[in-house]
Amino acid sequence: MTTTLWPQVLKQLEAVLNDQQFLTWIRPLEAVEEDNTLRLIAPSGFILDWVNKKLLSQIKQAVYLVAPVNTPEVTLEVGEYAIESFNEPENTSVPQPLRETKAEREAAEKAASSTSKKKSDSPPKKTIKHNLNTNFTFDTFVEGKANQLAAAAARQVADNPGGSYNPFFIYGGVGLGKTHLMHAIGNELMRRDPNARVVYLHSERFVADMVNALRHNKIDEFKRFYRSLDALLIDDIQFFAKKEQSQEEFFHTFNTLLEGNKQVILTSDRFPKEVDGLEDRLKSRFGWGLTIAVEPPEFEMRVAILMKKAAEFGFLLPDEVAFFIAKRLRGNVRDLEGALKRVGAFAQFTQQLVTVDLAKDALKDLLALQQKMVTLENIQKTVADYYKIRVADLLSKRRTRNIARPRQMSMAISKELTSHSLPEIGDAFGGRDHTTVLHAVRKINELKETDHRIEEDFNSLIRIITN
C-alpha cells in the first residue's frame, strides 16, 4: 500500500461531502497505513462517534474507489488526548548546535534560562492546524449583484484584520458562498503572514473541543489556545443556540480577541438577532462590527458560476446550455455545481457533446421535481404562510396594504419562477387582468431597489420555494 492512499481518499470525500462535513469531521482525522489497514485516528471521542455513525460507510466507499484491489480495512480509534492545536510543547528550549565554544554554550544556556522564565507569560508560537480549504480564495469566488458587497467587505477585512469590520458577520442561506468568503479571508491572511495564527472551524467543533477539554481537565489550555489566535473563523454560529456553557466560553473568547484587535469572522443562516436561543449579549456584540448578507445568485451570476465551474471541471460548456441550466435552477451555488457535474458525467459516459438536449436528459428528474414543487398554488401557500395571512386573502378583492403587498409579491414570484403567462397568473389570483400582474411585477422590482426589507423577503421566499 502506498503512502498516497489517504490524500486520494480525502479528494474523493471532498467531492461528495459538503464543506461543513468535510472540514469539521474528516479534516481532523490522522491516517496511518500499515498491514493493509487504514487506521483513522480521531482527536476526540466525540468526533470518532460522529464519524462512526454518520460517515464511516462513505469513507469505506472512497477507500474502495481509490484501491479496488486489495482494499484495506478501515479502523477508527481515538488518539492520545490533545487537540493538537492547543497542546503546548513540553520542552521549548532551542536545540544546541553540534559544535560550539564555551562562551557560545554559556550564552545559549543563559538565553534558554531566560526563555524558560518567560514561558508562562508568553507561550511560544507554534504551527497550528488552520483547517482552511486552500481552493477557496478570492480568485475562485464568483461575484455578482447578490454578493458583491459581501465580497468587497471581505477583502477589506483581509487588508485590515482587527480593524473597523470586527467582528465580520456574514449571513444567508445554504450554499451561497458564506464559507467560501470566510476561507478566502483566512487564506489571504496566511498568504501575507504564513506564521499567523488563523483557525477555521464549525461551531460544533468548538463545542466538541470545549467538552473534551472539560472532560480531560484541559480547559485552561483550551482557553489559552483560542484566546491566543490572530483570527478566529467560526461557521454556522446558529448551532451555539441553547448551548449555554459554550456561549459563555465563546463570549469571553470573543471579548479577549476583540480587545486585542484580533479578527473574528462568523457566519449564520440568518440575521444574528433572529437566531433563537442565542444570548442577547452575544447578539449585541455581533453588531459591533459589520453584518452583511449574501443572497441567492441572480441569472447572470448563475451563468458565470456555471461557466467558471465547467472550466474547473475541464469541459466546454456552450452558452446556450449554461443559460438553460441557469434559467431552470434558481437555487444556491451548490445546486448549480451538482447539476453541472451531472451534465458533465452524463456527456462523458454517453460520449456525447454537451448540448441543451443532453442537459435535459441528464437533469430530467431534477427538473421534474423542481417543476412539481414550483406551482402557482405552492407559491400562494408559501407567501401566505410567510406573511401569516390566508391564501383566500391573496385571491380576494381586499386592497389593504397587509394584503396587497403579499399579493404583489406572489405575482412577481410567479412570474420569476414559472413559465405561466401574465393572463394565466392573473386568472390564478382571483381572475385578475394581466395588466394587474404586470403592475405587481414592476412594483416589486422597484421596491427591491429601495426597500431592503422587500428585497430580503423576495430572496427569502425564492429560497424557500426553490429549495
Curated annotation (Swiss-Prot):
Pfam families: Bac_DnaA (PF00308), Bac_DnaA_C (PF08299), DnaA_N (PF11638). It comes from the Bacteria. Residues 87-129 are annotated as: Disordered. ATP binds at G175, G177, K178, T179. It is found in: Cytoplasm. Belongs to the DnaA family. This is Chromosomal replication initiator protein DnaA. The lineage of its organism: Bacteria, Pseudomonadati, Pseudomonadota, Gammaproteobacteria, Thiotrichales.
